[in-house]
Amino acid sequence: MSTKAIYPGTFDPMTNGHLDIVTRAALMFDRIVLAVAASPSKKPMFSLEERVALAKEVVAHLPNVDVVGFSDLLANFAKAQQANVLVRGLRAVSDFEFEMQLAQMNRHLMDTLDSVFLMPSEQYSFISSSLMKEVARHGGDVETFLPAPVYKALKARL
């Protein structure tokens, strides 16, 4: 039986922490769908189409990873993708409570959907998309924290 997992997120922008998680998840599961959420309430810097295109470029070297944009409820998206696992990154203990609530709600909505939590490699444990945007807006150097295509797009946007 093959296992298909979904790694969902807004990925605005995708960071090396995200890349670390999806790369390790790709070794654990047969197929990974990197699911880029529309998330209009978060007022993303990049459009859904731009985020999908950037993610595709960043994970092109991972043959078992597909990138798909979505705006549906995550559990419904998982059903449509015939996936039974959600991969989520946990940077700190502070992330756990919220992630646990999400996992329980997703399990309630789709009883065959399990959540697997991966901690990023230590050098990425403090990175977040919002932090990268904030630091970059104020002239800080975030190049080492972002995949090259994402860094280029972020610099061009600012």
Swiss-Prot record:
Protein residues bound to substrate = T10, K42, L74, R88
Looking up SUPFAM superfamilies in the UniProt record yields:
Nucleotidylyl transferase (SSF52374)
Main location, first listed in the record: cytoplasm
One Pfam assignment: CTP_transf_like
The UniProt catalytic activity note for this protein reads: (R)-4'-phosphopantetheine + ATP + H(+) = 3'-dephospho-CoA + diphosphate
Q: Which UniProt keywords apply?
A: ATP-binding, Coenzyme A biosynthesis, Cytoplasm, Magnesium, Nucleotide-binding, Nucleotidyltransferase, Transferase
- Which cofactors is this protein said to need? Mg(2+)
On assembly, the entry states: Homohexamer.
- Function noted in UniProt: Reversibly transfers an adenylyl group from ATP to 4'-phosphopantetheine, yielding dephospho-CoA (dPCoA) and pyrophosphate.
Family assignment from sequence similarity = Belongs to the bacterial CoaD family.
Q: What is this protein called?
A: Phosphopantetheine adenylyltransferase
Q: Which organism is it from?
A: Erwinia tasmaniensis (strain DSM 17950 / CFBP 7177 / CIP 109463 / NCPPB 4357 / Et1/99)
Protein's gene: coaD
